[in-house]
Amino acid sequence: MDRPGTTTLAPPAPLSPRQRALSLVEFAIGGAIVVAHNVFHAVPNEVPILFVLAIVSIRLREGSFAALGLGRPKSWTFTILIAAVTAVIVLAMGQFVTPPLVAAMGLHNAKSAATSLGLAKGDVWSVLKALGITWTFAAFGEEIGYRRYLLGRAADIGDRSTLAYWIALFCVSALFGLGHYYQGSAGIFSTACDGFVIGAAYLLSKRNLWVAVLAHGLIDTIVFVAIFSGVAD
């Protein structure tokens, strides 16, 4: 029996060697773009590029834009609940789990996403701008680019088996961390952990992309509002 809020997925058809090879090429190109922008600053921001690649690739290879994974879920209530629980887990990790690990490993912070967006306590314009970017560029752009596209293509390489999806999640979480290279080694590690939790929720909800999008948006919204109100630095 399916859980409410999830979509029943037919067992994936086996992929041909050619299809798997093409997915390997796509994943390699996507990963190279992430590194080229964030580490070497050799190409423009990777998120819009991955977003366009995702739209084109999914349309051509999977037949329709519906395959993107943003169709109407069976239950919005359950979808939002899963996203909210995911957000709570990520925020709790950020308070109690990753900081001691970061300290133990001797990792360093550079600057936070809030700092890069110019978010300041009591500044209404800065928080509105940050929230606008969060719910477009980050929540939709990053989740489609990283969780839907790169994770999907990485899993294709292993013929979309359950194990392949979880190995793909580890790989894409590492790339997601590198996507926040500007935050320093501590930021890379922390965002990789956050990306893993969001990605795990995505997989456990039977690849309901709304779970990842809403969780990502909720996490950033709570953090930004806390900074705006002075509850957090």
Language model features by range: what are they?
Residues 1-18:
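Short, Lys/Arg-rich, polar N-terminal cytosolic tail immediately upstream
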Residues 19-27, 46-50, 75-83, 126-131, ...:
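Residue-level signature of transmembrane alpha-helical entry/exit and packing/kink sites
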Residues 123-233:
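Transmembrane helix-loop-helix hairpins at the membrane interface
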Residues 63-66, 95, 99, 143-148, ...:
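Short helix-terminus and kink motifs of transmembrane alpha helices
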Residues 18-67, 78:
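Alpha-helical transmembrane segments in multi-pass membrane proteins
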Residues 42, 62-63, 99-107, 181-185, ...:
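Transmembrane helix-loop junctions in multipass membrane proteins, especially transporters and channels
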Residues 33-37, 53-61, 90, 94, ...:
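Structural signal for membrane-spanning alpha-helices in multi-pass inner-membrane proteins
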Residues 67-138, 156-159, 231-233:
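Juxtamembrane helix-loop-helix connectors linking adjacent transmembrane helices
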